[in-house]
């Protein structure tokens, strides 16, 4: 999948588009096709290296930890969500963030987007 990643810490110039492989979906996770994400202070602080002692991840790192989209796949133990559900989420803070075409989210971190809100 395509994602915006960093391969080193630095200014906005270190952001680059790359092909990335996500880890496998676990039994309590869903795959979300992204329609929107956001830029928050944690994103630029991590990109510039201010949080590297707290999050000791290997590169590449996909930034972003907010998403709105549609579920395209569910793990084997997911019971409250199904393919096609429109959702908001604040995924776990991992090196696989939301500046990407799709993202993996634990099922307990999802919220349903009301039908009155379009994507």
Kindly label every feature range from the protein language model.
Residues 17-22, 68-70, 102-104, 110:
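Conserved hydrophobic/aromatic beta-strand scaffold that supports enzyme active sites
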Residues 1-2:
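Extreme N-terminal starter segment of soluble prokaryotic enzymes
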Residues 21-38, 51-94:
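Glycine-rich beta-strand-centered segment in the early N-terminal region that forms part
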Residues 11-17, 50-53:
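Short gly/ser/thr-rich secondary-structure transition/capping motifs
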Residues 6, 47, 72-73, 104-105:
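Short beta-strand-to-turn element immediately C-terminal to the catalytic PLP-Schiff-base lysine
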């Amino acid at each position: 999948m395509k994602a915006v990643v960093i391969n080193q810490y630095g200014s906005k110039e270190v952001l680059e588009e790359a092909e990335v492989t996500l880890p496998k979906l676990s039994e309590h996770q869903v795959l979300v096709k992204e329609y929107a994400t956001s830029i928050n202070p944690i994103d630029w602080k991590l990109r510039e290296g201010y949080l590297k002692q707290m999050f000791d991840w290997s590169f590449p790192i996909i930034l972003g930890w907010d998403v709105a989209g549609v579920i395209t796949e569910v793990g084997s133990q997911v019971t409250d969500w199904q393919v096609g559900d429109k959702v908001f989420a604040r995924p776990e803070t991992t090196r696989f963030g939301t500046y990407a075409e799709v993202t993996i989210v634990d099922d307990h971190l999802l919220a349903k987007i009301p039908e009155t809100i379009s994507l």
